[in-house]
């Protein structure tokens, strides 16, 4: 099934460029379109701010964390599906993210097939 590149674009928000590249390669190999952002602030200034089909977000980033980004989007009524990935997650963080509406919360290293399944589910594919 061909993707509409504008309505099915996945935003990757992570301050680690190697992780951005790895996630983008994984998604593109699965036939999905992705665009990378090095910070929550960069994403908020972009044209995908409230229009991305799904977000893959690192929890811990300089300045604005993934959880703060999630709260900001909620304030602005941007109801985007968010999948969190983190190397520093704990139960409290996971509960907070899920209560705020996260689709998934994956600890690094994570299962690539599980991530793809969650992304496809968020995209209703």
Predicted regions and their residues:
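Short, conserved "switch-loop" micro-motifs in signal-transduction and mechanochemical regulators
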Residues: 76, 88-89, 100
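Active-site beta3 strand of CheY-like receiver
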Residues: 50-57
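Non-catalytic signal-transmission and effector/linker regions of two-component phosphorelay proteins
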Residues: 1-11, 17-19, 24, 45, ...
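Receiver (REC) domain active-site loop signature in two-component systems and cognate sites
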Residues: 61
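A Lys-centered signature of the CheY-like receiver
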Residues: 108
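Acidic catalytic/metal-coordinating carboxylates
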Residues: 38-39, 65-69
């Amino acid at each position: 099934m061909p993707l509409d590149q504008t309505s099915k674009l996945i935003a990757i928000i992570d301050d680690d460029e190697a992780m951005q590249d790895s996630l983008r390669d994984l998604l593109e190999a699965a036939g999905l379109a992705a665009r990378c952002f090095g910070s929550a602030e960069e994403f908020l200034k972009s044209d995908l701010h409230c229009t991305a089909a799904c977000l893959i977000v690192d929890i811990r980033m300089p300045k604005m964390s993934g959880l703060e980004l999630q709260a900001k989007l909620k304030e602005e009524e941007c109801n985007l599906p968010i999948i969190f990935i983190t190397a520093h997650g704990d139960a409290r963080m996971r509960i907070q993210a899920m209560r705020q509406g996260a689709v998934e919360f994956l600890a690094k290293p994570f299962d690539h097939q599980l991530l793809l399944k969650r992304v496809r589910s968020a995209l209703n594919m």
